UniProtKB/Swiss-Prot annotation:
GO cellular component term of the entry, any: plasma membrane
UniProt-recorded name of the protein: Inner membrane-spanning protein YciB
Topology with respect to the bilayer: Multi-pass membrane protein
Keyword Cell inner membrane (UniProt): yes
Keywords for this protein: Cell inner membrane, Cell membrane, Membrane, Transmembrane, Transmembrane helix
Regions that span the bilayer: 10-30, 50-70, 72-92, 118-138, 148-168
Lineage: Bacteria, Pseudomonadati, Pseudomonadota, Gammaproteobacteria, Alteromonadales
Subcellular compartments: Cell inner membrane
Coiled coil regions, renumbered to chain: none
Function: Plays a role in cell envelope biogenesis, maintenance of cell envelope integrity and membrane homeostasis.
NCBIfam families the UniProt entry points to: ispZ (TIGR00997), PRK00259.1-2 (NF001324), PRK00259.1-3 (NF001325)
Pfam families: IspA
Amino acid sequence: MKQLLDFLPLVIFFAVYKFFDIYIASGALIAATALQLVISYLLYKKLEKMHLITFVMVTVFGSLTLILHDDSFIKWKVTIVYALFAIALGVSQIMNKPLLKSMLGKELIVEDKIWARVTWYWVSFFVVCGLVNIYVAFSLSQETWVNFKVFGLTALTLINTVLTVVYLFKNMSEEDRKELK
């Protein structure tokens, strides 16, 4: 259920874009992200920081898109969110308080050097995706960008998540791996 909830705003944005335009889709994205927060709170009695950050970014950049009737803002939102994630991960690693380890370290027990590699891998991933988003958003058609945002970035993120889990699993002790099964 939680994973479906994570994709709700993206699905609504895409569907509304296909039937209307980027501006109505941006408004729908704002509403869907707000709805995501409400549903998440009702179901889990808490709000995740990532959802809150995303909501603020969607609201700010979506509103600018609507008010100024300029789709550049909603396109930049993707890159800025990725940059914030990269910065948060990088700073947490530099401060020896890796976010990924704090989120997953209880279930996936690996050495700190492995968490560092995974963290820097994700920092690099977010930076590259942010840069590619800029290229696609401002060099190709709006429809190509929407498809890239919805399908390309989502697929890349899912693939990288699977690769990360496999890498972490391979670097776990045999005993810890057995406990997961």
